C-alpha cells in the first residue's frame, strides 16, 4: 500500500514538472504565433492569417466594431494602408491548460491615403489548442491615447 501511495506522489510530482515545462514551451509557441500574426498583417498575407485564426474567431477592433474572420481577411486584403511597423512593446502570455491568453501593447506605424499614422493599442488575444495547432479564437484591441 505504501509503495502504491509513493508511486502516486511521484507521478503527480512528475506531472507538475512536465506541466511547468509545457507552459514555457506553450508560451514560446504563442509568442511565435503573435509575431507571425504581426508580420502577416504588416504584409497583408491573408493566407498566413487564415492559418492561425479560428473560423469562429471574434475580432473586436480598436474602434469597437466586431468582425468575423471572413470580414477581417477581406479588410486586410482591401486595405490601402501600408504598415511599416507592427511591433509589440510588451507581450505577456498566460497558459491555462489548452487555452493561452496573450496580452500587451502594440505599436503600429504606416501610411494610409498618403498620410502617415502611428497608433498604440492594448490587446488581448485568446488562443485555443485545437488538434495539433494553436488558433486564435478571440481578439480585442483598445486604443491608447
What residue spans do the PLM features occupy?
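Bacterial N-terminal signal peptides
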Residues: 4-15
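A beta-strand edge to alpha-helix "cap/lid" segment located at domain peripheries
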Residues: 20-52, 56-145
